A protein has these predicted regions:
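Charge-rich, well-structured scaffold segments of protease-associated domains
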Residues: 2, 15, 25-29, 46, ...
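Active/ligand-binding-proximal structured segments within catalytic/core domains
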Residues: 55, 64-111
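Bacterial N-terminal signal peptides
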Residues: 9-19
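Mature N-terminal segment immediately following signal peptide/propeptide cleavage
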Residues: 32-79
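Short hydrophobic "helix-edge" motifs at membrane interfaces and signal-peptide entry regions
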Residues: 9, 80-82, 206
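Bacterial Sec-dependent N-terminal signal peptides
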Residues: 1-7
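Sec/Tat signal peptide C-region and signal peptidase I cleavage site
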Residues: 20-24
Length: 237
């Protein structure tokens, strides 16, 4: 009787195991990903958009959960627009634009820090340059004044001394990046992906030789051609 009980228990246990094994062996159902267009439609961020008489596009998103405003200016200029011999200009101006303007001389960050701004920075890229800060709502007028002054009146503050200083900063940035472990791999990737005359064929930071050769007139001409309100988008949230 004892052996019979053990045998029956074993059969019962195997009976329990069989469905589990069958389930484990069944192929998992394939879930087809949703089309990207459908996913984009689900991102519903309300905003208003208008264009000022000077050509500046303005996009405003209102969310009053916190008394702050994110201010972001996107310039439609990046390294892909740089001609041969002028590489690194977009990145150079990302630095120059934080060095003061005609009606707001000195460090761009200082007056914003005084009103409690956070997230202050700028980023150059292949296709665009972006400057941004987040300020308390009462300081929005101050932030817009500073942005408008460096958009329209930057060049009066760009002297040969300022150019030389910021040129040196950018070149030092490049040296630091190049001398990190694997720092040169980006150049190998660009060489492998694009031809030398392709807009993406050179790095955003540019070459030391091109930066050395840049004159004050070259730099000012670059700004006049690319940093006007009709080539920018102001985003407020």
């Amino acid at each position: 009787m004892h052996l019979r009980s053990i045998a029956l228990s074993g059969v019962a246990f195997c009976a329990l195991l069989t469905p589990l094994a069958a389930t484990a062996q069944a192929p998992a159902a394939t879930v087809k990903p949703a089309p990207v267009a459908d996913l984009i439609k689900k991102v519903d961020i309300a905003y208003n958009e208008f264009t000022l008489p000077n050509g500046l596009r303005v996009i405003v998103h209102t969310d009053r959960k916190a008394p702050v405003v994110a201010v972001s200016v996107w310039y439609n200029i990046g390294s892909k627009f740089e001609p041969k011999g002028r590489t690194g200009f977009a990145h150079l101006f990302e630095h120059l634009m934080f060095n003061g303007s005609e009606n707001a001389p000195g460090d761009f960050f200082d007056p914003l820090k005084q009103v409690g701004a956070t997230e202050l920075n700028g980023t150059p890229n292949y296709d665009r340059t972006n400057d941004f800060e987040t300020v308390p709502t009462p300081a929005l007028e101050k932030a817009l004044f500073l942005e408008s002054d460096r958009m329209g009146y930057l060049l009066g503050a760009v002297t040969q001394e300022v150019l030389d200083e910021q040129r040196g900063v950018v070149q030092n940035e490049k040296r630091q990046g190049d001398n990190r472990p694997y720092g040169l791999i980006q150049y190998k990737l660009l060489d492998g992906l694009f031809s030398s005359d392709h807009p993406y064929g050179h790095s955003v930071i540019g070459s030391l030789a091109d930066l050395d050769a840049a004159s004050l007139d070259d730099v000012k001409g670059w700004f006049r051609n690319h940093y006007g309100p009709n080539n920018a988008v102001l985003v407020l949230a």
